[in-house]
């Protein structure tokens, strides 16, 4: 039996940055590599919380909680959810999301949100099976350079 662990990154380490960059390439072909400065910021700031899912001390998945307050309340976004391609189909994505939701509850009351491309059929089915519902809205993006 494998030892499965889940933890929040609270200090920058090169091994963590390397794991993030490996997983990012599997999440999006447009992702740029994370720098050690970005890792340091994420590990120490209050609004971003990076989590790793490990099997036998090997990082095989990650998720991020982005937390902010607006006039209508606290919002928590789940971002960058990915399980290493070699470990998919074993229920680890569900475990990762469920553990991330548990962490989000420390910010309650809040709205917990996430986005997922329509082409990610399995991921969308997973999110709905856990209790998320599809919200009819438009999400817009602008790159500010």
Report the location of each language-model feature.
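Conserved GNAT acetyl-CoA-binding A-motif
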Residues: 97, 104-116
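A conserved beta-turn-beta hairpin within the catalytic core of GNAT-like acetyltransferases
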Residues: 68-78, 88, 133-135
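Active-site rim helix/loop that mediates acceptor-substrate recognition in acyltransferases
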Residues: 29-50
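Conserved beta-strand in the GNAT
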Residues: 52, 58-67, 77, 82
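Active-site beta-strand termini and strand-to-loop segments that position acidic
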Residues: 54-56, 142-144
